């Protein structure tokens, strides 16, 4: 019997919401009898945007904004049908992007 694995990648701008969501997924998977590896923190993506402060000239006066994308990886090993059903019903915050691979 081949071993199955569900790989879940989570992305969010707020690390606190991301960690709460990862904890909910881990608790749900463990409660239904699956083995869990993670959450593994992946490198944070940092996008920096530089704009001119003045609308016309003054090129030396600039302002920088950044947005950080935090990421986590969770592997669920040997999931049961009960695990998959519980993960589908799980309610997570709206600021978290979830990517699931079987």
Curated annotation (Swiss-Prot):
Q: Which family does it belong to?
A: Belongs to the universal ribosomal protein uS10 family.
Q: Which UniProt keywords apply?
A: Ribonucleoprotein, Ribosomal protein
Source organism, top-level taxon: Bacteria
Task: Quote the function comment for this protein.
Answer: Involved in the binding of tRNA to the ribosomes.
Query: Which PROSITE patterns does the record cross-reference, listed alphabetically?
Result: RIBOSOMAL_S10 (PS00361)
* Alphabetized SMART domains for the sequence: Ribosomal_S10 (SM01403)
Gene3D superfamilies the record matches: Ribosomal protein S10 domain
Question: What processes does the entry annotate via GO biological process terms?
Answer: translation
Q: Name one Pfam family in it.
A: Ribosomal_S10
Q: Does the keyword Manganese apply?
A: no
Keyword Secreted listed: no
- Which terms does the record give in the GO molecular function aspect? structural constituent of ribosome; tRNA binding
Query: Cellular component GO terms, alphabetically?
Result: ribonucleoprotein complex; ribosome
**The protein's name in its UniProt record:** Small ribosomal subunit protein uS10
Quaternary structure annotation from Swiss-Prot or TrEMBL: Part of the 30S ribosomal subunit.
